[in-house]
A protein has these predicted regions:
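A short, surface-exposed loop/turn module that caps and links secondary-structure elements
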Residues: 32-59
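Enriched for short, Lys/Arg-rich terminal
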Residues: 2-4, 8-25, 49, 57-65, ...
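PIN-domain endoribonuclease scaffold, especially VapC-family toxins
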Residues: 24-32
Length: 85
């Protein structure tokens, strides 16, 4: 699968690379798991509602979430820092 970071999510990822390598490792593990099993697996995947209808969330930790959408053979990452706004 191909990973596509959307605007803010790439900035989030770069933030973690600079400030917390532990979160980068966790995000990479989640992305690898998503490519194998998009809607089950690590990080307690759950479908989102309202403005994020069609998207899924996985826990990075208690505060931060990885929000993504699977389209064909692409994983679109929308956020990987904070909760949904």
């Amino acid at each position: 699968m191909k990973y596509i970071f959307v605007d803010e999510s790439w900035e989030d990822y770069l933030y973690w690379q600079k400030n917390n390598k532990k979160y980068v490792k966790k995000i990479n593990e989640l992305l690898k798991d998503i490519s194998r099993q998009p809607f089950t697996g690590k990080g307690k995947p759950e479908p989102l509602k309202f403005q994020y209808s069609g998207y899924w969330s996985r826990r990075i930790d208690a505060e931060h979430r990885l929000i993504y959408k699977v389209k064909d053979d692409e994983i679109h990452i929308v956020k990987c820092r904070f909760h949904y706004d």
